């Protein structure tokens, strides 16, 4: 009981520390965030690579604000695994995000080095490198002026894209019942191009780097049910601090359910089922607390996760939620 109380206190203190972050000014940079980020922590922290004793392959799709034309649509495929007999994890992911005529596609390779500690505690230090393609599809612009001839010099008559590198860093500390992560998955700012010039579409501004802090605990309700509260905060020095709180419950028969709330005043319901401890499927429904937004601000998300058994490694890293 004392151990579980210590875990709860650690989680509360971490959450309060995170909420004390203060920032100013809104940033124009968009951030992709899945409703149930626990389905793919690799997307926000490269140190999560190889944090399970098995290889994990994940696929997810998120459709935001279903009642609004040009609303964000995101998809991701990722895989990560530990290397046998080495304190190393590797991973890779490819994702896409579409908002109106703006398209972003990214590919990243991940590496994590694990420092094993007593009592199954692990500190992972991660790095990722990849390429991000930004595209503006001017060909999809629809005009409602019958006199428009398409000769407006301010609107290009062709799609414009640019590809540039990006890098990320992260740290991930875990125990069998607690985890705490800190990361900056994109150290550079890949901007949408106005012209085909690589040098003008990549920047480094420390104040615009988005930092992520996530923490969670695993609590035994009884011999069959576990609760997993977790919190995620993300911000740059030039933006406000956003947070998301998730509370999920899981049963030993593979069923899971829960909900979440995020600072932009959105709530969600999460459900899932795991087949034979290998294949898992989850669905999330999100909506706004604002009555004026409820009709067209609903979002849907689905994830598939598949676990592939590996040869037992001498290096352990517990699995969370």
Question: Can you say where each PLM-predicted feature lies in the sequence?
Answer:
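Subset of outer-membrane beta-barrel
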Residues: 29-321
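Bacterial Sec-dependent N-terminal signal peptides
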Residues: 1-31, 247, 308-310, 320-321
């Amino acid at each position: 009981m004392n151990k579980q109380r210590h875990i709860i206190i650690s989680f509360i203190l971490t959450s309060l520390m995170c909420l004390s972050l203060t920032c100013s000014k809104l940033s124009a940079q968009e951030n992709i965030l899945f409703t149930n980020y626990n389905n793919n922590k690799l997307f926000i922290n490269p140190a999560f690579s190889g944090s399970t004793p098995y290889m994990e392959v994940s696929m997810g799709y998120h459709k935001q604000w279903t009642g609004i034309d040009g609303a964000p649509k995101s998809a991701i495929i990722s895989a990560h695994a530990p290397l046998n007999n080495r304190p190393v994890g590797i991973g890779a992911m490819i994702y896409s995000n579409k908002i109106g005529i703006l398209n972003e596609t990214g590919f990243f390779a991940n590496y994590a080095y694990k420092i094993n500690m007593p009592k199954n505690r692990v500190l992972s230090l991660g790095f990722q490198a990849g390429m991000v393609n930004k595209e503006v599809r001017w060909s999809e612009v629809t005009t409602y002026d019958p006199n428009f001839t398409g000769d407006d010099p301010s609107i290009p008559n062709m799609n414009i894209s640019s590809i540039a590198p990006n890098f990320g860093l992260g740290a991930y500390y875990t125990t069998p019942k607690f985890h705490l992560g800190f990361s900056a998955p994109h150290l550079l700012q890949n901007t949408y191009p106005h012209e085909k010039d690589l040098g003008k579409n990549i920047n480094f501004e420390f104040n615009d780097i988005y930092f992520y802090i996530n923490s969670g605990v695993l609590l035994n309700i009884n011999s069959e049910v576990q609760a997993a509260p977790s919190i995620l905060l993300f911000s740059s020095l030039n933006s406000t601090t956003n947070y998301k709180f998730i509370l999920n419950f899981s049963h030993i028969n593979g069923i899971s359910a829960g909900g979440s709330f995020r600072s932009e005043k959105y709530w969600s319901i999460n459900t899932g089922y795991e087949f034979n401890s290998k294949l898992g499927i989850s669905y999330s429904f999100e909506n706004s607390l604002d009555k004026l937004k409820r009709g067209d601000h609903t979002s849907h998300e689905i994830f598939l996760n598949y676990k592939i058994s590996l040869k037992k490694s001498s290096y352990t890293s517990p699995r969370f939620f």
